[in-house]
Amino acid sequence: VLLAVGLPAAAQNLTSVRILLGVGDTTPTRWDGTLQVAGGSMVSLDPWRFEGSDGISGATWHFSTHPVRLFSGTSPTSTAGNNIVANGVIATISTASSDAEIKITTAQGDFGFRLGELTYGKPVSRLEGKVHLDRIPVSTQITNTKEEEDFPAAAAGKNGEVWVAYIQFHHNPEHNALRAALDSPPKDFSKWKSPTGGDQVFMRKYANGTWGDPIPVTESGLDAFKTSIAVDGQGRPWVFWSQNARFPSRIPNFEIFARVMPGGQPGKRIQISNDPGNDVAPVAATDSKGNVWVAWQGWRNGKAAILAATQSGSEFGPAQIVSKAPANQWNPAIAADQKGRVTVAWDTYRNENYDIYMRTAVDGNWGPETPVAATARYEAYPSIAYENTGRLWVAYEEGGKGWGKDFGAYNTPGVAVYQGRAIRVRGFEPDGRVVQTVTDPGASLPGFPSIHFDKGGLQKDFEKLDPDPENAKTRKPDTGARNMQNARNNFPRLTVDSSGRIWLAVRSAHPVFWSPIGTVWTEFLISYDGKGWTNPIFLNHSDNLLDNKPALVSTQPGQLLVVNSSDKRRRYDLGEAINSPLGIMPTRKEDPYENDLYASTIDLGVASQPLAVADAPPVQVAGAEAVADKTDLAALKKIRDYTINTSAGDLKIVRGEFHRHSEISMDGGGDGSIIDQYRYALDAGSLDWVGCCDHDNGAGREYTWWLSQKLTDIFYSPGTFTPMFSYERSVNYPEGHRNVIFAQRGVRTLPRQPITEENQNVHAPDTQSLYAYLKAFNGIAAAHTSATGMGTDWRDNDPLAEPVVEIYQGDRQNYEMPDAPRSNSEKDSIGLWRPKGFVSLALAKGYKLGFQASSDHISTHMSYCNLLAKDTSRESLLDAFQKRHVYGATDNILADVRSGPHIMGDAFATAEQPNLHVKLSGTSKFSKVVVIKDNNYVYSTEPGTSQVEFSWRDNSPTKGKTSYYYVRGEQDTGDIVWASPMWITYTGK
């Protein structure tokens, strides 16, 4: 039960209370109950963690406590011990005073409380600790459509009003489904290429406690990404957005657009950027003269830069490049003070790790770049705001050293993408001195996400962010490297109100909970009143993906309005599915989840003045020399400089992978945001291409598919970096999980058909339909973890639709053959033991499969799919896959294996005895290099050098027989390279 759309909390004197019941329960327990208000009335009840038959009727609820819902082992916590978690309701109550009494009757006992007992950040208990009560901000739903409203931005007007911009995505009604299943094989695949309704930018006004109607800023049918808004000195709101100006062209071009909206009426539309590189992520602020500034991320000459432009009347001046380093720059943030200063902050990979820099313009003249946080640790995602005193506050994420470097089942000297984040806050005085609040925000923010809301601890107690090399060395059989038990607080949003009170919102998965569309992340708010930070305040209806940034705006001292989108994923009961024969994928015809906008209001009173601050250490810059892996950089240069000469033209080695997961996957709770996967690929991984391969692009939901497709185009930088359109299609053994890849945008994910039984020696109808679908859209697929419960017994293959296999993945093991290095075994198989799935058995059946390696979940920097391609265009990369011109490796190892004019992956006939010429260039010494023919070792050498080159001839071929030959190289570091087989038919002379 929700508040009426647009119903202003202030107009009703509303208070919201989170009532959690069954704290500490060890078995599922009934907590049916009723709420009564003396001196007021109940306005609404929201469910907390409902599932099954849990329900609400008026002021009465019927529910139990339940075992926590988690998916697989990729959740950032464990269910060891008691896994029964509290359930509850969120009550919104209208009262005339804080003396109102609330009485609650439950099946486990009765209790009561006075509203005045509850203050923000100070929970109370009842029934000997089995009941938890805390006051939370009232959340008002401000959109309620069947479409998706997302990416809100907000700005205060001159008269206390608030303007909100956002994007609305319009569904194709035929595809607004959640994992819809197929009853029979499709005969026509055209519906899986049908268009969406696209995006449209809207604006709304909030004034005098009332939300106005949506105001269209653009037409519908766009391909748009993120908004920003600012109000100029004349009181006119300016709305900014990024839009693919070439949509639906094959080559995207996102540009920054703006429209002034005087009095809420659309004015002239302006294109601010104009460059072949994509321009995205606008942020805006208004300077002391009333001019609006906008900053954004734009791709120039193959690298992402930070740019800015300034309003001049009803136009904007030319774009200026703010960042100067020749590395990728990310996440611009902007703020202006009342003395003519405008500051833009961002994070940069200039020092071979992420650091934060800022640059300030005074009266329009840019000063030098200044480091904000530049240690050897990961520092990213700044959010900035000025105090009235001219002090600039910066909040940002801090992670461990070695972010995005080697992490997987066999090696953990680095830190994976989402292995821990702490939020830091520091201030910069006008004279450059660095200060900090007198108490640590880490003593208020959530710690390591726990399944129990009261057990997570605090950030300050979970800050062992740096790598643990012993992690992989001490892993248990059948399990991967352990998730590091750190705080995971992300995407800080900071603002300062006119009294000087600092407001900080952060994203957390605490308490951990899984829904049918994935892990639940929510927003927590803390505030610094000049003396100390409040305890965390939960924001209702903030449940959504990890990368979900609310808009914070204050129009009165001590008060805050938070506008955010929620896809309602905390409501497990909305998406509960019927039992399905489709392996891990439940099925439901309609999609009950969609994004709406909500507004939360909170009043904590004015801050103490002046704010108490303490001196902080000056910023130290570690620099690239202290961070860079010179061996890695040299190996990358050698690979990129290398050319393979063939009769069909020169080929380059194009490094990448197409099996990375993110928040979009239903089991992506340990993987991090999807944009962080691109950050990893572009920077820490230094890849040339990537496929962000989430499960069905998010449970087969149209909206997350649309976002995934959009980002695949946003990060496309022709000639420099090539994202491919990719997803994982998971069907349990014996049919198998497969990663799908296309060179074209717009192909939707294919639903499932019923799975075949393991003891049935038949072709799988679902897999056969997948092959037909791939051929219809010129795509390919690759099975992964083939000798596990996610694998296949190789009952199916199509040489055109499935030309390669993921022979190795960093998150788990090698599936080449039994007893090969890093292969799984009956005693140690991460993801169950299914020996019929070894790749050697597929090759023995005559299947022609090239070899590639990719990461899967969590793992970084140790799985590479190296394509031998004419160039880096999407079409050339797909062509290399289809020709099996590919090799897999766990490090940046160069491999060139030929037979006469033929290269790895080729199938051909010869009258000569088959011969191989092998050239390997490693990152360390090769301890062994072997040649394998028809699943037998036929040659082995132990070179003890990093450079290997030799020729080998098969002196005993069988005339008329086709044999496959491939090379495996093993380094003394344990790293491996697999050159794809060649299939050679010996015809004899």
Annotate each predicted stretch with a short phrase.
Residues 1-6:
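Bacterial N-terminal signal peptides
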Residues 7-11:
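Sec/Tat signal peptide C-region and signal peptidase I cleavage site
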Residues 14-55:
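Low-complexity, serine/threonine/proline/glycine-rich extracellular segments that form mucin-like
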Residues 60-64, 75-84, 112-631:
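Extracellular, repeat-based ectodomains that mediate carbohydrate processing or recognition
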Residues 68-107:
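Low-complexity, intrinsically disordered segments enriched in Ser/Thr together with acidic residues
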Residues 97-99, 499, 557, 960-964:
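Extracellular Ig-like/FN3 beta-sandwich strand-entry sites
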Residues 109-111, 568-572, 971-978:
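Short acidic/polar inter-strand loop motif in beta-rich domains
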Residues 538, 589-989:
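Extended, charged catalytic domains and RNA/DNA-binding interfaces, predominantly
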